[in-house]
């Protein structure tokens, strides 16, 4: 059986993640990891706070605190939020930890010793007023490719191009706005063209998603160039190269190594051997969940880094790169107060299952999608409550009232066949990371149940004295509910577990390999039935702006950033 390494892009802790960040990486990765466990697969699911680099220094300077003081608070705040969203990490760590820092330094020394690192003198912007070099986001200016006026010195947000500060037109200091002067400084470069030899051929024949292939191949066609891996800033991992005192490793290059160091950290904590078992097995299957702007770092740069170490690390098995989630037709913007952040969301609607399921239903898998409160309301009230919750409540209360909470019978063969077909489609979609499609198949199961119940009319059968037929109908409905609980588990884990217990099934719905029991006979018991979901109030859409403002006022007092 293959070993799966599920990696969610590491949230950068200069802010709290918004809904687009949540669905683009962390939540999608969690749904996939939960599915794999249910299929009995060997899985390790990791991520962590990305906390080094210039954006953190910029924010810390604004607040008059040390970078670590800032990231300590934000890391804990975000980690607790992910727990509230029921994210099932095996390890959610951070880049400023000894295991990661040591692993990064050791890895770059291997790359250096293998001849993939060279030095080159650069002319870099220097702020005479602040008396410092201006790497990455310490410099802002106009993008030379798309003309965006506020492009950062590491990447343009508008067009996604990777940049260096000298590329910017009309550069200025991010702190004081002064025009910089240019000074020479020595830096260490990763020979990306040399290290990436053979990776393009691998990419072309791989089964990576088309959007990943297309984005990467277009990026490669424009020409791979050596990339500077050191920076003239203090907050980061000290560069290990001889003569590189005072330099740090560029945050993008060290953060992607976190997928490896997070597994190594698990071994340090637990005395296990997971790093050898997962990362030293060439047949392991790393699957990365990222936003589309992070594609090159996962499709070319990370594989090139790992290849340059001389170790036989597995190449990406899949890169699930989502498009953008918009908010009511606009891009998320903290500055313009456009969007919903994940702490605000739970204040407006506290049930994490609602957010998990709704965001998966809106997941931007092939194109940008639009989060609207109207669509959220429809998904919660129509899909979760009417399709799933109403079917569950009808079945459970009927069995309790008319059969004393226990029923045995025969499962309808046509229903069995239909469920088996839906299960097969579901498994296929999930392995291909078509999470939105798979969530729709869960709804199809529930709708099948509602249709079957309405057509068979067990209440009529009982009136006509056909008790055995009525028992068969309700036993079949419990069979469908068991399937709904199993297949709902990755998306709405709390509701699935509650349903599992109400239909009297033993153990937990989240036990490893549980999905392999699809098609099994139900327990035929009903225990303490109650509504699985609660509908959002009828005036929710009228009041949501007011509710959101209340939520913002509340979380702004609690946020560390």
Swiss-Prot record:
GO molecular function, a single term: methionine-tRNA ligase activity
Any one annotated GO CC term: cytosol
Spans through the membrane: none
Sites where the protein binds Zn(2+): 143, 146, 156, 159
Record-linked Pfam families: Anticodon_3 (PF19303), tRNA-synt_1g (PF09334)
Chemical reaction(s) catalysed: tRNA(Met) + L-methionine + ATP = L-methionyl-tRNA(Met) + AMP + diphosphate
Main subcellular location: cytoplasm
Cofactor(s) annotated in UniProt: Zn(2+)
Alphabetical UniProt keywords: Aminoacyl-tRNA synthetase, ATP-binding, Cytoplasm, Ligase, Metal-binding, Nucleotide-binding, Protein biosynthesis, Zinc
InterPro entries recorded: Anticodon_Met, Met-tRNA_ligase_1, Met-tRNA_synth, Methionyl/Leucyl_tRNA_Synth, MetRS_core, MetRS_Zn, Rossmann-like_a/b/a_fold, tRNAsynth_Ia_anticodon-bd
Compartmental location: Cytoplasm
One GO-annotated biological process of the protein: methionyl-tRNA aminoacylation
Gene3D superfamilies found in the cross-reference section: HUPs (3.40.50.620), Isoleucyl-tRNA Synthetase, Domain 1 (1.10.730.10), Methionyl-tRNA synthetase, Zn-domain (2.20.28.20)
Residues holding ATP: 334
HAMAP family xref list: Met_tRNA_synth_type1
Family stated for the protein in its record: Belongs to the class-I aminoacyl-tRNA synthetase family. MetG type 1 subfamily.
Described purpose of this protein according to its UniProt entry: Is required not only for elongation of protein synthesis but also for the initiation of all mRNA translation through initiator tRNA(fMet) aminoacylation.
Protein name, UniProt field: Methionine--tRNA ligase
Record organism: Ignicoccus hospitalis (strain KIN4/I / DSM 18386 / JCM 14125)
